[in-house]
Amino acid sequence: SAGPFRIPKCRKEFQQAQHLRACQQWLHKQAMQSGSGPQGPQQRPPLLQQCCNELHQEEPLCVCPTLKGASRAVKQQVRQQQGQQGQQLQQVISRIYQTATHLPKVCNIPQVSVCPFQKTMPGPS
């Protein structure tokens, strides 16, 4: 399936950006920590800063589609690694998307503040 990339240009940007590698690592890290991460305007951790840099290199149009691609990749990783089932897995996955949703705002991406991902992703795909 075309997945998040209905816009071919964005798929290309996603590949050029090495699938937003830093963002994937950041999403994974955040999702595996239960509890909310640091609040407020603390120093950005270096990994988050790298992720923001990746997003700033995208065209605004592609920020959400590429983030969605990154989220999906992380979701797959978690599924394979964890062997977690049901409830716990769903929580991790929803944290991935929650984190991704707000990244444009966290990173001050012009013209994009929140990516409209569904909060609850449908069951195993």
UniProtKB/Swiss-Prot annotation:
This is Napin-3. The small, basic, water-soluble napins are one of the two major kinds of storage proteins synthesized in the seed during its maturation. The keyword Disulfide bond applies. PANTHER family: 2S SEED STORAGE PROTEIN 1-RELATED. It comes from Brassica napus. The mature protein consists of a small and a large chain linked by disulfide bonds. The keyword Disulfide bond applies. Coiled coil: none annotated. Belongs to the 2S seed storage albumins family. Disulfide bonds join C10-C62, C23-C51, C52-C107, C64-C115. GO terms for molecular function: nutrient reservoir activity. Keywords: Allergen, Disulfide bond, Seed storage protein, Storage protein.
